[in-house]
Swiss-Prot record:
Name this protein carries in UniProt: ATP-dependent helicase/deoxyribonuclease subunit B
Matching InterPro entries: ADDB_N (IPR049035), DNA_helicase_suAddB (IPR014140), DNA_helicase_UvrD-like_C (IPR014017), P-loop_NTPase (IPR027417), PDDEXK-like_dom_sf (IPR011604), PDDEXK_AddAB-type (IPR038726)
A Pfam family that the UniProt record links to this protein: PDDEXK_1
Enzyme class of the recorded protein, top EC level: hydrolase
EC number annotated for this UniProt entry: 3.1.-.-
Annotated positions binding [4Fe-4S] cluster: C822, C1144, C1147, C1153
Gene3D superfamilies assigned: 3.90.320.10, P-loop containing nucleotide triphosphate hydrolases
Family: Belongs to the helicase family. AddB/RexB type 1 subfamily.
A single GO molecular function term of this UniProt record: 5'-3' exonuclease activity
Gene that encodes the chain: addB
Cofactor(s) this protein cannot do without: Mg(2+); [4Fe-4S] cluster
Length: 1186
């Protein structure tokens, strides 16, 4: 028995020596004594390939390439000890989660975090760590008795309790830890003959250190193998040096001493170490290491790295680059271009190239996107997490759906997995319905059909749904039936509900979930039955085949492996916890802890691909080119968080009591230097270091000290800066990856310099060459197509216009106002009929429906009971309002006002609002003055009043027909003449500005007055004259005062606040008829009489009869103008802007039209701030007459 150390720095030839030795032995004696090649788990495949690549080795039987786990497996297979399977990490975490749930009332220090997501994983890691370092629960308990630190003392006791429960559980089940396999294999090797090790030669490579369990197994190898040769990255002259944690080679020096001590303790012969290279370390030449024989610069880097005093390289280095990217994507784009050039121009294979990052989380999506864009085959060397996979989400959300009683969020998470027999279109359709109508779990479970529809006519009861709504409800209920039929039995089983129970009894039992305990076996069985019912296995197979057809081998392997993994997970739950009685919430926590721990190891799809890995995991052999990306501060060296259950100070305390866990963060930081050295020295020909100046969110990032250290070592090294695309004075050849990339980068450069003529001469020549010699390629690239893209919409074709409006435009005044605000908004609203998703909540539109319907019903009640508005007593008015509010609460949005305490509060506020509105409107109603003749009077087809139909001179064969509803029409008599007042309700106080009317932004009141005057015969039978058109703000304001006021003063202030706004006839007698107040009506209306002389103040909103009629005629002409613009097909975004407000401010279609002032096609039309618009209207109407 002997051991020999193979010592040398990185790249000195240790691994090549081992492979050469093995291949020579295999050639000399293919059936000779066993050869063991022990390497880290992730390096076994590479070592197999390295040996098989030798031209004269096509296979072997005597060679065993093993990791410690595989070695222990072989030992236990031969000697016994694996009758039961090892406990997997997933099983371990579920067991620990269950123990924490059972012990949650016994824990104090760990109580707050015991049920939190992720804590069971941390505790699982700690227990694994304890097992690897041969720490038992009893040791933790004993040390806790010796400590004076109360917090640590109690923490150790609680950890010991959980640890003991875990150990006891496994003993009863007959399982053992994965971590124990190494220790058990080491014990089996003591005193037993291991046949496959008899007479064997063992080579060990790729390790910088060993855990106590690995050392135990290594000790067994020392006593069983004939010869062991252990390779360590350690300069021979350091083997006798003082143990200094700060030294670069401290990790391997510590390992050397540990193995030496094992050999001495077991009387193993320690042969003279073999040094690499075979000359004195201090006198070797810069390029004497085999790996760097062709690159003196990389040899110099290896030699000088880690020294306190660096010897600068005296010339410009080759094969070494530093690049700063403006951002992470530009950094990876530069790497991708370099890889393509290396393969295309320098004869590299993709497998000769590796990309190393410190952590994959931020880089993975960018690397995938950019490498796929450049068509670079690559393999991510990591365990693939599966928490976003549809099957994993299905397992979580199916149980959560039952727990939450079919709550929206988990239910639709489950539906959107694609594993239920419901199409995506059906899911989106029913989701919109559920969100709009506030569908709850009990609504899903009831057998009856859903019949909620959007009711925009709250005044009438039991309105029959239209044919369109009937079809819609039929589709919705069909989808509801599919969901219900699929899940109801599963739900009943988990709740322990008998199918023969009445529906009311079932609902009564649904609230008893916490008391309804089922065994883990029962719940898992029901879950499995649902999986089988849905034929999920076949769906995964179908997805796998589809992925294979797309050549997405990563997704293909995910689907294939995950099915078996999930089956194994459920098996373990039943095996370990089968008879354990749990609530559904506890079961969910247990299965979630298991699912969170699933990570799948995927195989490379091909051998010739770029390996993308992390510095601490990935192992490389014979890599020629290495791209070290993300060399930023905080990543190299890594920030090692002290976030474990036992922190660094506590670990140091435990070490003082002879209990040593894994290294502290400080020790890991020391080891980080060795890790960096190991990465930097991997490539034999080229090393690229890069870092981004900003992260993905634009935050500034600083380069790592590695960059400054290398710049100090290589003062002649030129640092590159990678911007977003090429520069005009830059060598463009590196951007000519292929034709499309050449065009793409040329376009970027043209955009940057402003014009093709400003390109440098070589770029102009390339541009001309591509256009003349490869026009198809040039003009087919997306960037060139984008140059022709105009961010404007062409007018609709006449064919489309005729289909939309065959004979007429049937619309509303507000529809044409919408067109005036922005033609695209009108197109999206009226033609495309785009709508925002509706939610079950109170919105301005719903509130508008409420108070319009409330005021209409109040008027109807007055009519039914032969009451007059102004003669109602307060208590009578309040009784009517209360009755109306109760009626509307039942009708508004599926009884939303009764849905919760919050909405019941809104109901109260709406009651106050309606009550105030009715009170204020009574001030304007007097049967001796102006009094309503109708409320919410419709005009249009099948309405009391005729359609407002206007001729369109530019389109003789078409007309515009306007429909709508007038909130209130009042009339009053003066000297036998009937005057008309039109009132429109708004959610808040609003002015009518002639400027807005002139430009077509506010035509509603004037159009309504025109409709009323044209329909005078139907309203009163008499001719009517204009009296006023007013907006009434339905609001209940709080009026501020600077001192206490009397009720009369408060009433006066309220009048001023709630006055109607608009335009009135300039007749004082008519205006006095407008209110029933004893005092002058000007407190309630928008006018003010002069006191010193007859007439109105300048700011009074009054018009003469001639002016009134001119305004109404102008309104008609404006409506015609807008209708003709609609018929011309105008749909391009052209929003109005008024000061700081524009049509885009609250527009829901902004994301659709993509209005952007950076494009010349896009601009606002501005509404002038001031002007005498009455004069303009009068002038234009005078011109029309002429």
């Amino acid at each position: 028995m002997s051991v020999k150390f193979l010592l040398g720095r990185a790249g000195s030839g240790k691994t090549s020596y081992i492979i050469d030795s093995i291949t020579e032995q295999l050639k000399a004696a293919p059936d000779g004594d066993p050869i063991i090649f022990l390497v880290p788990e992730q390096a076994t495949f590479q070592m197999e390939q390295a040996i098989l690549r030798r031209s004269d080795i096509s296979g072997f039987s005597r060679l065993h390439i093993l990791s410690f786990q595989r070695l222990s497996q072989k030992v236990l297979e031969e000697q016994g000890g694996i009758a039961k399977a090892d406990l997997s990490d997933t099983g371990k975490e579920m067991i620990i989660k269950n123990i924490l749930l059972q012990r949650k009332d016994d824990l104090e220090i760990l109580e707050k975090v015991a049920v939190k997501s992720g804590f069971s994983e941390k505790l699982s890691r700690l227990i694994s760590e304890a097992r690897m370092y041969e720490i038992t629960p009893e040791m933790l308990e004993q040390i806790s008795q010796e400590l004076d630190l109360i917090h640590l003392k109690q923490k150790l006791q609680e950890i010991s309790q959980v640890f003991t429960d875990y150990e006891t559980f496994l003993q009863h089940q007959g399982y053992h830890h994965q971590e124990d396999r190494l220790s058990k294999a080491g014990q089996k090797m003591e005193g037993n003959n291991i046949s496959f090790l008899a007479g064997s030669t063992c080579y060990i490579d790729g390790f910088s250190g060993f855990t106590p369990q690995e050392l135990k197994l290594l000790e067994g190898l020392l006593t069983k193998c004939s010869n062991i040769e252990l390779a360590l990255t350690l300069p021979p002259q350091f083997t006798g040096k003082i143990d200094d944690e700060l030294h670069l080679f401290h990790p391997t020096l510590k390992t050397y001493n540990q193995v030496w001590e094992l050999a001495v303790n077991n009387d193993i012969e320690i042969k003279k170490s073999k040094h690499f290279p075979n000359e004195n370390e201090e006198h070797r030449s810069a390029s004497s290491l085999p790996r760097f024989k062709d690159n003196p610069a990389l040899a110099h880097l290896e030699k000088e790295w880690g020294k306190n005093k660096i010897n600068p390289y005296d010339s410009e280095p080759t094969g070494l680059s530093i690049v700063e990217g403006t951002n992470l994507r530009n950094e990876i784009d530069k790497i991708a271009r370099e890889i393509k050039l290396l393969v295309r121009d320098h004869g590299m294979r993709y497998k000769d190239i590796a990309v190393i990052v410190r952590e994959l989380e931020s880089y993975e999506p960018v690397i995938k996107a950019v490498f796929n864009d450049y068509k670079i085959p690559h393999f991510l060397d990591r365990k693939e997490p599966v928490h976003h996979h549809p099957l994993v989400e299905f397992l979580r959300s199916s149980v959560e759906t039952v727990i939450s009683n079919w709550d929206y969020e988990p239910l639709f998470r489950m539906l959107k997995t694609g594993l239920l027999p419901i199409s995506s279109e059906e899911i989106f359709q029913v989701e919109n319905y559920v969100l709009a109508h506030g569908i709850s779990g009990k609504d899903w479970k009831k057998q009856g059909k859903w019949n909620f529809i959007a009711n925009f006519d709250l005044e009438r009861e039991n309105i029959a749904p239209s044919n369109r709504n009937k079809q819609y409800l039929s589709e919705i209920n069909s989808i509801k039936g599919k969901v219900r039929d699929t899940l109801l039995e599963f739900d009943s089983k988990l709740r322990g509900i008998n199918k023969s129970e009445s529906l009311s009894a079932q609902f009564k039992n649904q609230e008893a979930e916490e008391d309804n305990l089922l065994s883990v076996r029962e719940i898992s069985t029901y879950l499995w039955e649902l999986i089988e019912q849905l034929q999920i296995e076949y769906q995964l197979e179908e997805w796998s085949l589809e992925a294979e057809e797309r050549k997405d081998f990563v997704e293909m392997q995910l689907h294939n492996q995950l099915w078996d993994t999930v089956i194994d997970l459920l098996d373990q739950m039943v095996t370990f916890l089968g008879e354990q009685k749990v609530t559904l919430s506890e079961y969910l926590q247990i299965i979630e802890s298991g699912l969170a721990n699933i990570k799948l190891g995927l195989l490379p799809a091909t051998l010739d691909q770029v390996l993308v890995g992390t510095a601490d995991r990935s192992r490389y052999h014979e890599i020629k080119v290495l791209f070290m990306a993300g060399v930023s501060d905080g990543l190299y060296p890594a920030k090692i968080d002290d976030d474990g259950i036992i922190d660094d100070r506590e670990r140091i305390t435990l070490r003082q009591h002879d209990v040593e866990f894994a290294p502290t963060t400080e020790q890991k930081l020391y080891q980080e230097q060795y890790l960096i050295y190991n990465v930097l020295t991997q490539p034999s020909q080229k090393l690229y270091l890069s870092y981004p100046a900003a992260d993905s969110e634009g935050r500034t990032m600083s380069p790592s000290t590695i960059i400054s250290d290398i710049q100090e070592m290589f003062p002649e090294l030129f640092q590159e800066y990678q911007n977003d695309g090429p520069e005009n004075d830059e060598d463009f050849r590196q951007y000519i990856i292929d034709g499309k990339k050449a065009v793409s980068n040329l376009i970027k450069l043209i955009n940057k310099v402003g014009h093709p003529e400003k390109l440098a001469e070589d770029k102009q020549q390339l541009l001309a060459y591509l256009i003349n010699e490869h026009p198809d390629l040039f003009y087919s690239t997306p960037e060139i197509k984008a140059l022709d893209y105009k961010k404007s919409l062409s007018p609709l074709t006449q064919e489309v216009i005729d289909k939309l409006y065959p004979n007429k435009i049937a619309t509303s005044v507000s529809g044409l106002e919408s067109f005036c605000q922005c033609p695209f908004r009108h197109f999206a609203e009226q033609n495309l009929r785009l709508k925002e998703r509706e939610y079950f909540r109170l919105e301005p539109a719903s509130l508008g429906l409420f108070y319009h319907a409330g005021l209409k019903l109040f008027w109807d009640k007055l009519q039914e009971n032969n009451l007059t508005w102004h003669k109602l007593k307060t208590e009578e008015r309040e009784a009517l309002v209360s009755e109306i509010v109760e009626v509307l609460s039942e009708r508004l949005k599926n009884r939303i006002l009764l849905a919760s305490e919050r909405y019941k509060y809104f109901k109260k506020k709406l009651h106050e609002l309606l009550s105030r509105a009715v009170e204020v409107l009574s001030w304007y109603s007097d049967d001796k003055g102006f009094y309503p003749v109708g409320s919410e009077i419709g005009f249009g087809k099948d309405e009391p009043l005729s359609t407002l139909e206007l001729e369109l001179p530019s389109f003789p064969n078409k007309k515009v027909q306007l429909k709508g509803r007038i909130d209130r029409i009042d009339t009053g008599k003066k000297d036998g003449d009937l005057y008309l007042r039109v009132i429109d309700y708004k959610g808040k106080s609003k002015n009518l500005e002639l400027r807005d009317l002139y430009y077509g932004l506010d035509l509603q009141l004037a159009a309504y007055m025109t409709v009323a005057m044209r329909n005078s015969d139907k309203l009163t039978g008499d001719q009517m004259f204009p009296g006023g058109m007013l907006y009434f703000g339905v609001e209940n304001p709080v009026v501020p005062t600077d001192k206490p006021v009397s009720p009369a003063q408060a009433r006066d202030k309220l009048k001023s606040t709630l006055k109607m706004r608009g335009y009135l006839i300039d007749d004082e007698e008519v205006l006095d008829l407008m209110t029933r107040e004893d005092e002058n009506s000007q407190d309630l209306l928008p006018y003010k009489l002069r006191t010193s002389s007859p007439g109105f103040y300048k700011n009074s909103k009054v018009l003469s009869e001639q002016e009134f009629l001119a305004v109404l005629n102008y309104t008609e002409s404006k409506l015609v103008e807008l209708a003709e613009r609609v018929l011309s097909g105008e749909i391009a975004p052209y929003p109005y802007k008024d000061g700081g407000y524009s049509a885009c401010t609250y527009c829901p279609y902004l994301a659709v039209c993509q209005f952007d002032l950076n494009y010349k096609e896009h601009k606002f039309w501005n509404v002038p701030a001031k002007g005498d618009y009455l004069s303009l209207i009068l002038e234009e109407m005078e011109e029309v007459k002429e």
